[in-house]
Regions:
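Mature catalytic domains of secreted/periplasmic carbohydrate-active enzymes
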Residues: 1-178
């Protein structure tokens, strides 16, 4: 769940078939245009308790919640990014609401976390220069901070599932394999 839910698979009248969460990349949407979607993010009908009750009724034992997808939009008020739900009209900590609701129903919570982050200025698809290396090092520090923040803020979460790790910058970096 992220800003990509607002346009779905359509941008400026063109429909992009496939996963809506890839729209920013496929449509080559400029960062400033994509950030404008934050002004619209306001899921006022969202009810974490209702989701958790329905999951329990269906016999669900665990859920995997997207903390942020490749677009970098955080569903928690991260102190390391301004690209979060806290900067939207909704303002509430969606992850916190979901974790509490599912835990209250006895359902284990696991987190999905995209290492790739299209919104971060220091993210690099590959490292081709010393400047890239320095920038990517800053990005890895940012990522470490976000992961520690999530683990500390939501201590009942059982594990993390990492996505977006196929770029050369990540594959060739010892940070990821450490």
């Amino acid at each position: 769940w992220g800003l990509y839910a607002i346009p779905g698979g359509e941008w400026k009248g063109k429909v992009y078939n496939g996963a809506a969460e890839w729209l920013k990349s496929w449509a080559k949407v400029p960062a400033a245009d994509w950030l404008e979607l934050m002004k619209q993010w306001n899921p006022v009908k969202f009810d974490a308790r209702q989701w958790a009750r329905m999951a329990k009724e269906m016999g669900v034992k665990y859920v995997k919640i997207t903390t942020k997808h490749h677009e970098g939009f955080c569903l928690w008020p991260s102190q390391y990014s301004q690209y979060t739900v806290a900067q939207t009209p909704y303002r509430k900590d969606i992850l916190g609401e979901l974790v509490k609701a599912y835990n209250d129903e006895g359902i284990d919570v696991h987190f999905y976390f995209s290492v790739m982050d299209w919104s971060h200025p220091d993210y690099r698809y590959e490292i081709t220069s010393k400047e890239d290396s320095i920038a990517f090092s800053r990005f890895l520090t940012f990522t470490d901070h976000q992961l520690k923040e999530l683990a500390t803020r939501y201590p009942t979460v059982k594990d993390f599932w990492f996505d977006g790790t196929w770029d050369a910058s990540i594959k060739k970096n010892g940070w990821w394999t450490a």
